């Protein structure tokens, strides 16, 4: 799924209900990129990444501040949360003008806030982002694919977006 040029999201909660089948070398991901800005300065919102047979999912933000400058702990830019490996799980991010809050199965995993800093590019997330749902096979983070584990799928049940009403 690739919504660039079709649907972009800002100021709301996006939820994806998906079952992540396991295989060595499988790297399913649900993530977002800015509609009109370049990476990494425009940011990246990783709503879910799972590696191989893990029983956790990774949630991360990337930006010039976290990726290029390597500042990942002030504020913390990543977390993990437990998943049910053989069931559907709900992955979510709430997008606010001054923070991103991440959830797995309605359990809050972490919040990435806008902070005061002299460094550039700390919070580029107050802009429209498009959604990507994909399955990569192999890579530096997951290692080589084991052919005997294939085929492998990510089954998506639904995607919901809840737009916050603007204050008048």
Task: Please provide the spans of the model-predicted regions.
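GH16 jelly-roll
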Residues: 1-168
């Amino acid at each position: 799924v690739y919504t660039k040029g079709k649907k972009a999201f800002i100021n709301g909660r996006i939820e994806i209900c998906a079952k992540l089948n396991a295989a060595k070398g499988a790297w399913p991901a649900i993530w977002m990129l800015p509609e009109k800005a370049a990476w990494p300065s425009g940011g990246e919102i990783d709503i879910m990444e799972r590696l191989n047979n893990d029983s956790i999912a990774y949630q991360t933000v990337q930006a010039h501040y976290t990726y290029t400058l390597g500042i990942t702990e002030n504020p913390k830019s990543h977390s993990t949360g437990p998943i049910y490996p053989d069931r559907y799980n709900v992955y979510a991010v709430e997008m606010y003008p001054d923070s991103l809050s991440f959830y797995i199965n309605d359990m809050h995993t972490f919040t990435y806030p806008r902070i005061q800093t002299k460094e550039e590019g700390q919070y580029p997330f107050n802009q429209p982002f498009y959604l990507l749902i994909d399955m990569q096979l192999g890579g530096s983070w997951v290692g080589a694919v084991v052919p005997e584990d294939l085929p492998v799928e990510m089954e998506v049940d639904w995607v919901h977006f809840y737009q916050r009403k603007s204050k008048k």
